[in-house]
Structures are given as C-alpha cells and as structure tokens.
C-alpha cells in the first residue's frame, strides 16, 4: 500500500463489512473527494477477490453526506458511536441488509430529530440491532 493510499472500511447492504484500499485517496485532488468521509453514504465499485481480505476500491460517489451531523458535536458523537457499534458487532463479508437500513436510518434520524431526542434515538437503534 502506497503513501497516497487510504485503508477504508465500508459497510454495504449486499456485502456487509469490507476493508478496501482506495489508491490515491490521500492526494489533494483525489477522485474520491468526500465520498470516503466517516458517516457518508455512497455508491462504491470495488474489485473483490475471494482469496483476499483487503479489496480495491475503484470508484466511490456520495449518495448522501450527513453535513448536519458533522457540524454538531453531539450529533456527530452519536453518529460515530452508531457506526462504531456496527463495526464491532459485524464480521467481514456477512451481508445484513436490515442492519444497513437501520444504520442509514439512524444517521438520517440524528440529523432530523430535536436535540432532546438524540439519546433516545440511539437507545432505540441499539435495541433494534440487538433484535
């Protein structure tokens, strides 16, 4: 892996958790732009190989950037915690479309709910994914 490459963990509804190398992602004018930022929903094209745990990211485009989350410390903290929880409770290459939808939904929720409801939403998310 070169010094302009970036190791990224993606979570997809079809493939589950994937570790990929984004070649050239650390360059100032990277083709990936904000698509590899934390808490960004995107459309990714990867070269998957059955004999490897580390795959190659060919392209990635932003579908939804959660800019409200990134500007608000409390919302960002809970969004990061939700992503971390999914990362820790999943293994690579295990598809779980329901979990993907729950994660995407809670990130949208963190952007839309009132400040007083953020913690309750996080607890609800934990209960939903534990089911």
For the regions a language model picked out, list residue spans one by one.
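Non-catalytic alpha-helical scaffolds and adjoining flexible linkers that form interface surfaces
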Residues: 1-7, 11-131
């Amino acid at each position: 892996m070169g010094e302009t490459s970036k190791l990224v963990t993606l979570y997809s509804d079809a493939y589950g958790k994937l570790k990929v190398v984004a070649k050239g992602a650390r360059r100032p004018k990277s083709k990936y732009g904000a698509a590899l930022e934390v808490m960004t929903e995107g459309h990714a094209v990867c070269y998957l190989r059955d004999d490897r745990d580390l795959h190659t990211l060919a392209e990635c485009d932003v579908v939804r950037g959660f800019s409200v989350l990134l500007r608000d410390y409390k919302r960002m903290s809970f969004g990061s915690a939700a992503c971390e929880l999914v990362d820790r409770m999943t293994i690579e290459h295990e598809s779980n479309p329901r979990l993907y939808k729950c994660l995407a939904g809670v990130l949208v929720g963190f952007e839309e709910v009132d400040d007083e409801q953020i913690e309750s939403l996080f607890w609800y998310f934990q209960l939903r994914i534990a089911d």
